[in-house]
């Protein structure tokens, strides 16, 4: 919408979006491994063992592919790890949070999503006090939840478009 309102043509918008796809990353975790087991993305024995031990996989989506982002033990630790991954991304790519569109996404549990959203905003504001640190909060769709389960939770980042002078 910002690009349209600034007078960009459709071709200019598509060219910019294609070039910026590499800046898109999603850092997320799941409530348990049941849906990943059922979908064949993880073995039954290792998945059930991880569920019993409270191990949460950290999943990274970048360049159109899914990668392992490590593991965390317990739900709160998985929130913290996703937040660390976001902060590391910002450090590695420069700028401030205001140079990016940041979104916290949650599945079924809106309260859990709000907790991560508040933690994310607080951490960003502590590290970048001069930045506005806008962070959106959205519910993920059923297309994602069918693969991850209803309690997926994470954050997405994409570079913001700025009109060139």
Q: Where on the chain are the PLM-derived regions?
A:
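Mixed-charge interfacial surface used for oligomerization/domain docking
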Residues: 1-165
């Amino acid at each position: 919408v910002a690009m349209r309102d600034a007078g960009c043509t459709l071709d200019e918008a598509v060219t910019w979006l294609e070039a910026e796809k590499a800046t898109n990353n999603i850092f997320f975790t799941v409530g348990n491994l049941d849906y990943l087991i059922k979908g064949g993305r993880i073995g039954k024995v290792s998945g059930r063992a991880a569920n019993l031990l409270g191990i949460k996989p950290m999943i990274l989506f970048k360049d159109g592919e899914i990668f392992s982002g490590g593991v965390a033990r317990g739900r709160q630790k998985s929130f913290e790890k996703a937040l660390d991954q976001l902060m590391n991304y910002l450090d590695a790519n420069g700028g401030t949070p205001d140079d990016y569109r940041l979104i916290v996404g949650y599945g079924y549990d809106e309260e859990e999503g709000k907790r991560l959203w508040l933690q994310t905003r607080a951490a960003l504001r502590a590290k970048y006090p001069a930045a506005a640190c806008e962070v959106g909060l959205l519910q993920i769709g059923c297309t994602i939840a069918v693969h991850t389960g209803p309690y997926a939770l994470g954050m997405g980042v994409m570079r913001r478009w700025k009109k060139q002078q």
